């Protein structure tokens, strides 16, 4: 392998940074409830699906192993942000500062919700990357659009099935949880479909610029093999 091949791709680094920013931003936006018509959703819906689109692009161009590294880096940065926010929230505010309640609403995530969010993110993201990788091998690199959509459906479904029962079970009425989960999956998948033409162009550009189009033949899919690149 040449020295150039050992160098880290600048575009991969930029995608990694954007991925982490999306995850951290989604955490903050999740604290606001929004309405789309008559449907109540969390503000994280605005940006969180972008992380799945980035995951698709990375897995398609650089392969599952780079996507695995990206997911763990995103998880670590997100955890670091949440931990620092919780630490600052636990420190008493200055006597003259009147925004304690607002700060706590954003950074005082209940441990149950934070844990559910982290577990759901890891499971959903790895399923998304795994499905994307395996379908590319089965389709011999064809049908990117179908692979991107189906991997998102599987990933987002797993994310919702884990997050909502763990975080909101006993808080939201049992009959409402399935509706909430379904709408999250439908809208997040719809988000991906709407931006799919742009995603296709980005993937095409990345493959040409990077000279990469990785097929994951014979790799280890163990999610803990972080540095097995």
Question: Which stretches of residues belong to each language-model region?
Answer:
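Short, highly charged, low-complexity non-transmembrane loops/tails of multi-pass membrane proteins
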Residues: 203-229
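Internal alpha-helical transmembrane segments of multi-pass membrane proteins
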Residues: 138-157
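Transmembrane alpha-helix/helix-exit interface in multi-pass inner-membrane proteins
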Residues: 78-96, 117, 121, 125
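Membrane-interface interhelical connector segments
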Residues: 88-112
């Amino acid at each position: 392998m040449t020295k150039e091949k050992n160098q880290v791709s600048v575009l991969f680094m930029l995608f990694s940074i954007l991925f982490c920013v999306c995850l951290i931003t989604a955490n903050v936006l999740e604290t606001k409830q929004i309405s789309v018509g008559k449907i109540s959703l969390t503000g994280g819906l605005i940006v969180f699906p972008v992380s799945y689109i980035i995951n698709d692009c990375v897995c398609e161009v650089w392969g599952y192993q780079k996507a695995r590294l990206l997911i763990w880096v995103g998880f670590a940065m997100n955890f670091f942000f949440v931990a620092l926010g919780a630490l600052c929230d636990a420190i008493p505010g200055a006597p003259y500062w009147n925004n304690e309640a607002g700060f706590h609403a954003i950074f005082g995530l209940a441990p149950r919700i934070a844990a559910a969010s982290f577990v759901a993110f890891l499971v959903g993201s790895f399923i998304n990357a795994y499905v994307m990788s395996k379908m590319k091998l089965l389709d011999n690199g064809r049908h990117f659009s179908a692979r991107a959509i189906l991997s998102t459906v599987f990933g987002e479904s797993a994310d919702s099935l884990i997050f909502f029962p763990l975080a909101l079970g006993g808080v939201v009425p049992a009959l409402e949880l399935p509706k909430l989960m379904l709408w999250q999956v439908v809208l997040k998948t719809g988000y991906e479909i709407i931006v799919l033409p742009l995603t296709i162009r980005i993937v095409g550009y990345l493959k040409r610029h990077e000279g990469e189009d990785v097929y994951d033949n014979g790799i280890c899919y163990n999610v803990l093999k972080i540095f097995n690149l």
